[in-house]
A protein has these predicted regions:
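Unchanged
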Residues: 1-146
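Conserved small/polar residues in nucleotide/adenosyl-binding loops
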Residues: 150-157
Length: 157
């Protein structure tokens, strides 16, 4: 926590290591700042099989892309908005959230922050439409990295 508290950064990006993509964070941070959100979650809306979703976090969102509920590892399929496990927030919000979680014995960002507090926090979605792949096996790791070599990212302004 000492490193975080002494950082001069105003915003922080939290990212898991189970997604392969080539992502430019600048427009995501800019969208986060513009929206005034507590947390901005990078997500993709698409049609998914139950196998694709069973290890994912799924967001229900309103017309303004505000998260209204969070499902963790749901047994669903079809069109849904799934998390890429990339989140933007202010450094101050992160420190406050971590301190509160530690005081309460909370250990899960998805369950204790996103799911439990989605109605009291302003959690917004940044819709990501470029190539990504979730990793859940050695085979998916290999296939995803090969695909990334041959998939050119869409240009962004």
């Amino acid at each position: 926590m000492s490193f975080i508290k002494h950082s001069r950064a105003k915003y922080v990006i939290l990212s898991d290591c189970d997604v392969v993509t080539n992502i430019d964070y600048k427009p995501i941070v800019a969208a986060h700042i513009e929206s005034g959100a507590d947390i901005t979650a990078v997500a993709h809306t698409g049609v998914y099989s139950s196998d694709d979703i069973k290890t994912s976090t799924v967001f229900n969102v309103d017309a303004d892309k505000k998260v209204t509920s969070v499902l963790i590892n749901p047994a669903i399929s079809g069109t849904c908005t799934t998390s890429l496990n990339v989140f933007v927030m202010s450094m101050d919000f992160l420190i406050e959230t971590v301190n509160d979680a530690m005081a309460r014995g909370n250990v899960s960002f998805e369950r204790n922050i996103l799911q439990e507090k989605c109605r009291e926090l302003k959690i917004k979605i940044y819709e990501y439409d470029n190539y990504f792949s979730k990793l859940n096996s050695p085979e998916s790791y290999f296939k995803s990295n090969i695909c990334l070599l041959y998939t050119s990212p869409s240009p962004r302004d």
